[in-house]
């Protein structure tokens, strides 16, 4: 029994003193896995820079062009008919006071 306790204490001391590796082993399914990763990363970095440049050029082009403003709607005579006076006077709340057109 004493030998089991000593053996357990020694194995525990050895496992505590042993350097711990926190890096998990990497599974390579092909012999050139590291090369493919670097190639793919470089490829997508180039695609990203190309995308940023093309989107910036497109934005500059679109924003530099003027845009067409629509025509004013026709002044229909039935739009400002008032059959009853407002309680606050002849002008509407959001109209310019003393507007002669309406």
Curated annotation (Swiss-Prot):
Keyword Mitochondrion: yes
Transit peptide: 1-36
Compartment(s) of residence: Mitochondrion inner membrane
Entry's Gene Ontology cellular component terms: mitochondrial inner membrane; mitochondrion
Keyword terms, alphabetized: Membrane, Mitochondrion, Mitochondrion inner membrane, Transit peptide
Function: This protein is one of the nuclear-coded polypeptide chains of cytochrome c oxidase, the terminal oxidase in mitochondrial electron transport.
Family to which this protein belongs: Belongs to the cytochrome c oxidase subunit 6A (TC 3.D.4.11) family.
Cross-referenced PANTHER family: CYTOCHROME C OXIDASE POLYPEPTIDE VIA, CYTOCHROME C OXIDASE SUBUNIT
Protein name: Cytochrome c oxidase subunit 6a, mitochondrial
Naturally occurring in which organism (per UniProt): Arabidopsis thaliana
